[in-house]
Amino acid sequence: MKTLLLLALTAVITSSSLLVLTAATTETIPPVSTSGVIPVQKTMKAFSSESELLAYLSRVATSVQRRADEELQKSALSVSSVSAEPPAPAKAEAESVTNTQHAGVDEGGIVKVHGNHLVVLRRGRLFTVAIGDGALRPISSVDAYGPDIDPSGTWYDEMLVADNTVVVIGYSYQRGGTEVGLFDINSEGRLGYRSTYHLRSNDYYSSRNYASRLIGNKLIFYAPEFLNDADFSRSFPAVRKWHKGATASEFQRIVPANRVYRPEINLDFTYVNTMHTVTVCDLANGGFDCQATSVIGPPGHVFYVSPDSVYVWASTWGRNEKNRSIVFRMPLDGSGPSALRVSGSPVDQFSFLQSEDEYLNVLVQSSGKGDGMWRAEVANGDVALLRIPIWSFSDGSDAAPSWSYRPLPKPAGYGFQNRFVGRYLIYGTGSGWGYPRENEAKWNLFLVDWARGSSHQLKLAHGVDRIEQMGSDAVIVGSDGKDLHFSAVRLRQWPEIVSRYTRKEASQGELRSHGFFYKPDGDDSGMLGLPISVPGRAGNKHLFENSAAILFLRNDSLQFREIGELGSQPERAIDDRCRASCVDWYGNARPLFLRGRVFALLGYEIVEGRLDDGRMHELRRVNYAPGQRS
């Protein structure tokens, strides 16, 4: 459970829609994306019948038990393949407030926009705040779960908005899997509960990744499920519509045998004990039509969604064994899944880039264990860049050739961060979820031109806690133990640090990628926002403490200038009588740039700022906490 894991983590760091089930077919799920097909050598094979699938699972169970008895583990990867009807085209006027990895692929978060309203998910409740016609006014609030649901043992983590549907994604230890709550929202910002569904899965939580994506009106989930040796049927992906008194027997399978795929490998190759599933649910017309595809493989996983494909990298970690892994690709155009045997493991979703030259680029570590729970925070090992053409994917029998791995310098320390920005892979280490450290000898920034192969190393005056794109360049954010630094990096043929801004006696208030936002207003200019807190604060404190303020910096040709901050007023906090999700797993502060206005989401406060003579001033604020309207 997250609660128990949280205690362990803290100790370590401190020291009415209808559910539609699709009948079995021999085809993959209809396409989500209408992008052109990138051909591969061959695709994976699905099972031809239920009996063939069960026989294979029995062999898997036997192999797993034998290997466990021998205390041997090996690595591999698995992925699922899923799609749905082509998504509705994005509205031209849509403006995102989420710092996503790829444009057009929304990610589950804590704040979204619906028409003239902000929609906020906070501590087990949904809220709307009117922003149309210059307003800033709370409108509606409801529990983020159904009226007949006991929210104890459930974490409501993410939220997405599609047309007039608000989707809340959580994980229920009590009801057994990913919990999806659907809510109606109208043009006046009024919220109303519609229905709840459960998708059978193990906990999807990652300290860095997000469990859901949204392309058009198609909701995409990834979820692992460990195989149950006693009853394999309890491991198959299934959906249940919730009602009072619902039982486990009401789960209905959404993956027939002929949409379960296996890599063409010997079972001795790896420790195979997990079913990895990608599910696509159609939210059009108020429905919840879910279809899924699964692949059987080892437990370690990292989930990445490009604009036209889903990738799952699954692996096993062993004591005295060479790392072996498999990466699976599921195109969103509806074509079949494919796989490739590989080595190592990515750190998180930002370790991936499907580039426009039709290559998959992945930073891998020799000792990586995926990004489930907090594994990304302790990632370590030798580093390499894997660069492989997408056409080389096949049925899992082929391996990426050794020359496709380029060994890279290994940075000292932990808190590993990586990201592809433009033509460069950028990585380094910082403080992560721990306390900021003073260690200048370890503060180096590594940059690799992934297409041309050149490498560069730059000396920093601080750690690498955040890597973000800023126009065609990058900004590196990190601490030196006392102050918070922003280094502007020009990404040309020879990368260089152009300038550095230092905010004295401050630290990052948020660690997740959604905590940052850069709003460009020219080719080389714009404004960035980032939550900040007191100096020396451990990264994990964002789970329990609010940020002090949102800091805003002006960028002009990679020269930073502070334009001010919008601060919280903790003295105005009230008891919200929290019943669910009382830990901020996804943080609680966001900079918001919307329709020429600037907001700071700070817990239960939304503060609006205005630029006067190049300085940020507070215009007004509203507290949208339950029972409070001011």
Regions found by a protein language model. Name each.
Residues 10-22:
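Hydrophobic alpha-helical membrane-insertion segments, chiefly the h-region
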Residues 21-630:
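Beta-sheet-rich non-transmembrane sensory/scaffold domains
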